[in-house]
Amino acid sequence: MNIRPLGDRVVIKRVEAEETTKSGIVLPGAAKEKPQVAEVIAVGPGGLVDGKEVKMELKVGDKVLFSKYAGNEVKIEGEEVTILKQDDILAVVEG
C-alpha cells in the first residue's frame, strides 16, 4: 500500500477481532465489535500543527490502542484503513 499521510496524521489498519468468545460462542461478522487495536502502516512527518511543533512518536509497525470514534475510515487498494491524528492514539501496545 502506497500512502503518505500529511502533518500529524497516522494511517492504521485494525487488527482482526476474535471470532469466538471465551465461552466458545462463534460470532457472526455483524455481531463482532470493531477492534480498537491496530497496526501503524504509515506516519506523517509531523511539523507545525496549529502553530505548535509536533514530533511524531509512532513508527510503522507499532501496535496501538486508539479512540473508538476517531479518524476517517477509507478503502485504499481494497484494504480498509483509518486515517487519524496522532492525538487520537491512546497508547502503544508493547510485548
Curated annotation (Swiss-Prot):
Cytoplasm found in the keyword field = yes
UniProt-annotated location(s): Cytoplasm
The Gene Ontology biological process terms listed for this entry are: chaperone cofactor-dependent protein refolding
- Which GO molecular function terms does the record list? ATP binding; metal ion binding; protein folding chaperone; protein-folding chaperone binding; unfolded protein binding
Listed InterPro entries: Chaperonin_GroES, Chaperonin_GroES_sf, Chaprnonin_Cpn10_CS, GroES-like_sf
Domain of life the protein comes from: Bacteria
Q: List the disulfide bonds.
A: none
**Under the cellular component aspect of Gene Ontology, which terms does the record hold?**
cytoplasm
Main subcellular localization, coarse class? cytoplasm
SMART domains from the xrefs? Cpn10
Annotated CDD domains = cpn10
Which keywords does the record carry?
Chaperone, Cytoplasm
Q: Belongs to which family?
A: Belongs to the GroES chaperonin family.
What this protein is reported to do is described as: Together with the chaperonin GroEL, plays an essential role in assisting protein folding. The GroEL-GroES system forms a nano-cage that allows encapsulation of the non-native substrate proteins and provides a physical environment optimized to promote and accelerate protein folding. GroES binds to the apical surface of the GroEL ring, thereby capping the opening of the GroEL channel.
Report quaternary structure and partners. Answer: Heptamer of 7 subunits arranged in a ring. Interacts with the chaperonin GroEL.
Query: What's the protein here called?
Result: Co-chaperonin GroES
Q: Supply the gene name.
A: groES
